[in-house]
Design a protein with these regions (language model features):
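Histidine-/acidic- and/or cysteine-rich, low-complexity loops and terminal segments associated
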Residues: 1-50, 73-83, 117-126, 147-168, ...
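Juxtamembrane transmembrane-helix termini in multi-pass membrane transport proteins
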Residues: 45-99
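A small-residue-rich subset of transmembrane alpha-helices
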Residues: 82-114, 189-222, 229-234
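Transmembrane alpha-helix/helix-exit interface in multi-pass inner-membrane proteins
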Residues: 103-118, 122, 131-158
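Alpha-helical transmembrane segments of helical membrane proteins, especially in multi-pass transport
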Residues: 143-151, 173, 177-201
Length: 265
């Protein structure tokens, strides 16, 4: 492994580890969820982006390392000088645009999904809440079997296929490819974040669970089977929740998952 590749690997892992620490110790998101204050939204965006770095960076390591390798091959003349001046910049821009996609996604989820969702859930009957969350889980589970999911996960599983289709030279190319990779990743993973947001912003337990699932989907060559297995589980949980057999979210106590007999009345 070349020196620059080692630096990239260590940097991604270090940022991910630091972001996990930040996510564990971050402030409660509830005040931000009920407010459109720009300062609070900015704080949320920073916290959300740190959480995305924690969850997603381990899974994108193969993509970033291959990008660096392709840049090195492309810049075979005076490789050492070019690596120091351009390769690092392009890799940083590639990863940066990937994070920008997720940062904007977080703001969109907050304003268009979480705030109204929180308002509806907190004022609804527990049975209605069960149906709402059951519907979300069923919808997310069905998506795991769609052609769009299959296409997006294909590019995430195979970095080489992604670059063969989307390769673009220069700094602008790094920005463009980072954006496309972020969008493909979003297309692959958005149901998990829809669920995570609905059940509790940046809850460390859900973050860890979905991070493991995403890592399995992206790293394993049969990641689509991970996705479909998760889809089956989500649909099953959604049906049970809709029928009132389990409580996915208790709007009187907070996020929970328990048999209906233990439901708080």
């Amino acid at each position: 492994m070349r020196k620059l590749q080692k630096i990239i690997l260590v940097s991604l892992v270090s940022i991910s580890a630091f972001s996990w620490i930040m996510s564990v110790n971050q402030p409660d998101m509830m005040d931000i969820m009920i407010s459109y204050n720009p300062v609070l939204i900015g704080l949320f965006t920073a916290s959300w982006t740190a959480g995305m770095a924690a969850m997603m960076f381990p899974a994108i390591v193969p993509m970033v390392l291959l990008y660096n390798k392709l840049l090195t091959n492309e810049q075979s003349i005076s490789v050492e000088a070019l690596e120091s001046k351009f390769s690092r910049l392009k890799v940083i821009l590639f990863v940066g645009m990937y994070l920008v996609v997720w940062a904007l996604t977080g703001v969109g989820l907050l304003l268009a999904w979480s705030v109204p969702m929180n308002s509806v859930v907190m004022s609804s009957d527990p049975k209605i809440v069960g149906i709402i969350f059951g519907s979300i889980l069923i919808f997310s589970g069905i998506y795991q079997f769609t052609p769009l999911k299959n296409k997006c996960i294909g590019y995430c599983e195979s970095p080489l296929s992604f670059f063969m289709r989307r390769w673009s030279n220069g700094v602008a190319g790094a920005l463009k490819m980072g954006t496309f990779h972020g969008l493909y990743c979003l297309g692959c993973c958005w149901p998990y974040f829809l669920i995570m947001v609905a059940l509790g912003w940046m809850n460390i337990t859900w973050m860890a669970l979905f991070a493991v699932i995403i890592f399995g989907e992206k790293i394993w060559s049969r990641g689509i089977w991970v996705a479909r297995s998760v889809g089956i589980v989500l649909v099953a949980l959604g049906i049970l929740s809709s029928l009132g057999l389990i409580v996915i979210y208790d709007n009187t106590m907070g996020m929970d998952m328990q048999p209906v007999n233990n439901m708080v009345m």
